[in-house]
Amino acid sequence: MKKSIILLVSCLITTLLTANTYIDTSEDNWTYGTMHQWQAHIAYSVIDEIAMVGDVVYALSSHSLFSIDKITEEISYHNQLTGLNSSVIHHISHNESLNELMICYQNGQIDIVDETQEIVNISDLYHKQASISKQINDICMYQNKAFLAMDFGVICLDMKRKEIEDTYYIGTNSTEVSVQFITILDDTIYALSNQTLYTAAIDDNLMDYSYWHTSPLPVGKEIQGVEAFAERVCIVRDSCLWSYHNQKWTKHPSEFSLRGLRKTKEQLFVLVANQYGAFEVMPDLSLQLTVPYGYVHDIQKDGNSYWLATENNGVVRTENNNYQEFHPDGPINNVAYRMRFFEDRLYVLPGGRWATENKTFGEIMYYENGIWTNITNGQLTDACEHPLYDFMNVAQDPNDKNHYFITSYGTGLLEMYDTTVVQLYLPNNSNLQSAAPNDPDNYTRTDAAMYDEQGNLWILNAGGDINNVHVVSAQGEWHSFNLQQHDTKDVIRIETPGEILVDKRNPQWKWIPLCRYNTGLVLLQDNGSPTDPRDDKAVYRQQWVDQYNNLIIPEYIYTIAQDHNNTIWVGTSRGLFTIPAHIDFTQSNQCEKIYVRRNDGTNLVDYLLENEQINCIVVDGANRKWIGTAASGAYLIEIGKDDNGNTDVHTIAHFTTDNSPLLSNNVLSIAIQESTGEVFFGTSNGLISYVSDASEPEKDFSNIYAYPNPVYPTYKGFIIFKGLMADTQVRVIDSSGNAVTILHSNGGEAIWDGKNSYGERVASGIYTAICNTSDGNAYGVVKVMIMN
């Protein structure tokens, strides 16, 4: 797509990211692993709306947009990377007069797309100062205009001039009215609030509230759609069809439970709340099954065929009882509550607890070699003969990557082999405990799961009275025990555990965050005998004192991580703190908060991300911290020392929905593919990834390489040296042995812009990169050819 309006956004605070964050991925610009490239991974199986513009069918799925070329059947994806101006799409609609597509975003942004794929952005509503929602509830196209139903009234948008023409406050004395639906019949505009019908002649002064006349709607709870048809205004309310004619409402009983109306060309369809398909509304307002096809959300007529937006099968084209399904590749759920990489396989789990994504259908998604594998809730529940909700964590067998376990916050522990269910574990067939003994089917809460170095599977079981820690041996034997405070022998009750973190210094040390109720941290030392708790030592702390003697008592703990310096990072509901390696957790409740000095000459400091809810912390190959917050997007920070030896915090990047393609500022989870440095952000609106400039360092230089290699004249991106050891210095020289530039690695890679130390593009030729570790004990050499 082409942009006809370019909007300036806030620059990222970074020394590495360029203004051209979205690198061109055409053949001329070399596609694999392009630095700083974003890629959206959206669930496209459930289609909410469709619209046709010329030979293109647009489909809205889970707030994201893709299209199908009716001639070539090619699928294209449309997002901020391709020119759209925001991320969370609420509605799409086709203007037949201009043959243009309107895209309406949840935040009030509007894009208009014509037949040539040119995009014009209308941001007036987005920038409007208003405390009420800017979400567009409904759209009615009329000639060259679009009438928008808003929570404060009606907006008239001139699509030809690409501007908002007027805003109508239609309540008494021009007060705000929440308009849910809008339609036009015979030059009369009909705007529906929840209980009242507002009407006015389209040519009247609609800005004058006195021209708007009111009448009651049929009594009911929910309006589910409105369309003009057969000289009547038709609505669906409380699953029943009603029509309005001569100022009178008439109910049209049906044996079906209706849930919406869709008008396409001269036909009106009702959508039903079951698997029947779409029923055509006949001129006498009787119903006739025209398109028998499962659960349909939207329908568009195209000659002798219909295009359907379906619940589970993507977009479907049907003609003469022949059906063709269009399935874009991707996950099946946009909730990425937890993610975890095992080598190059990424597991994505939709789950949650408390008020966060709670009661999400249990589904398993994993991404490997560019391909998504999805296991639906229906497949899993059919195999288990048991409902499954809120998948929380995954543990993959270190000896067989196809064998893994999934924990659930309510429905037990699921054992899988590839895509097949092996066993569902509940209290009736395992040592698991239920938080509600009388309802084990819904309250068997498991969260943390991991394999230790001996091949034992650890599971933390929330809410049971006794034996909350389970260790399953490689032979399948269950061993269950309590955590006991070492000095008092008091039982440490596990209410809501987080993930188990195995300490890098000693695999016998397990850090266990207790997230709420008895919020705190437990350090368990199992003495190398995890199935025998008698020699265990557990230390449990709920409060700490920072370097300024401030008392820290977290209300909630959401995440912990350990960096390459063995510092433990703790993310809470109000910021973060650290437990450096030199502090002995078993003997001291000391901690440190990360502070940022103000640049105002006062020498005052602020704590890093103070009062932010920290959902996740992940450490990359360069020991930098990727931090996901509940409201402010994602941060990439680096901790060092200034010239005076004081802690120096460098914010390398801060990604939000305003300055990047990030899908939501609520970042639920982050996972990094160690081999490539690609960072995956699981948000409340879906999953998106970003190729960073750091990967895990290698143990030697045996796998060193450069890419792209050769570098063609059309390539404008970075040259990347991969397979480096930690703290590698890369000295680039030309064929005559002259020094060109010196680079330093971020973990296992270093990037070069193809310029010399004076900022000039180097000449064509073969360049040698001599790589040395900081201690000089190892070196490697790689060559790269540059053609200008």
Feature locations, PLM:
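Extracellular and select intracellular beta-sandwich modules with Ser/Thr-enriched
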Residues: 778-782
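Terminal processing/anchoring signals of secreted or surface-associated proteins
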Residues: 693-697, 706-709, 737, 752, ...
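Short, surface-exposed loop/turn motifs with a glycine/proline- and acidic-biased composition
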Residues: 80, 745-776
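Carboxylate-rich, polar loop motifs that coordinate divalent cations or form catalytic acidic clusters
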Residues: 4, 20-704, 730, 739
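Glycine-centered coil/turn sites that cap beta-strands in beta-rich domains
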Residues: 699-731, 749-752
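Sec-dependent N-terminal signal peptides
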Residues: 4-13
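Positively charged n-region of N-terminal signal peptides that target proteins for export
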Residues: 1-4, 788
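Short, glycine-anchored, charge-dense loop/turn motifs used at functional sites
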Residues: 729-740, 767
